[in-house]
Amino acid sequence: MILAALNGLDLQAADIENAYLTAPCREKCYTIVGQEFGDDCGSIFIITKALYGLRSSGAAFRAFLAGRLDIMGFKSSIVDPDVWLWPGTKPDGEEYYEYILVYVDDILCISYKPKETIGKIQERFKFKKDKIAPPDFYLGGKVQLKGLNGINIWTITSTDYVKAAVENLEKQLGKKGLKLPSAVQPMATGFVPELDDSPELDAGDHTTVQELIGILRWAIELGRVDICHEVSILSQFQASPRQGHLEQLYHIFGFLKKNPKLTLYFDPNEPKLDESVFENGSTAKDFKEQYQDAEEELPTHMPKPRGKAVRITAFFDASHAANKVTRRSHTGFVIFVNRAPIIWYSKRQNTVKASTFLSDFLL
């Protein structure tokens, strides 16, 4: 979406109907049918299509669709095999890459004329309701093209997903006579999860903790960066959660109820950064002294650059000995392409370091 806005390209999406059933089975499979087949009961049926439920059906459909994209001239990228690219040219002669992004049976096409490109896929696969349209929802997130300061910017928000998750949890709590707490921040002030000595949960509540963390993790994937750190911390206790950990998960949902809206703007503009500190002065000298043989490693078989260039920026930080029991630190980072966040992450470090300097070098 960043590249689309940056290069003046359009987006179109489609959903393949009965996706697996379009692909041939990759294994020799058969079944002995039951009474529901009438006179054929007890007969041996040979399975020729990648039926839902077969272990290899997902791989069979993926390979079948990949073959179609390859015939169209698209090439799978080295970094992500489900991102396909093809060199395109605008009427004015400007070169760019067309992209097709695949997530199981969801297709997203980025091109100057995406309907023509995605229509070639439709020649072999039937789309649900024969619909090819700009994306509105993708994997639970609402996608919109908005104007900001005279620039078209793609956005994604998890508002609908969050509201549905909160409402579902409130219904479950209502059956127990409980309510979500009102919260102004994701985690209660002063709560230290590793020092919590409340009772351990039974099997039922243990499963509830795992389910709630799964729901929250997907909300993070859809842009709720503001709860990433807190959910990461509580995820450490999924093996043996306590009552206090469950209550803190309720606290996070209470925070989401109070703050359901958060929109990420994938701004294609290049950030204004002062890099002179790395080019001259004492900092540059220090880097040269410590990394005198350092060279930029570029991937092999890189495709020819086409379209406008982008700048990748990473912001990184780590605590030191934040865990009061293990003395382990916690790492967090956000990676931007131009001014659009694309990756955000928070995790506990696997080893213990003696200084803040060393903890900043670990993931």
Regions from the PLM with identified roles:
Residues 1-363:
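Long, low-complexity, charge-biased intrinsically disordered regions
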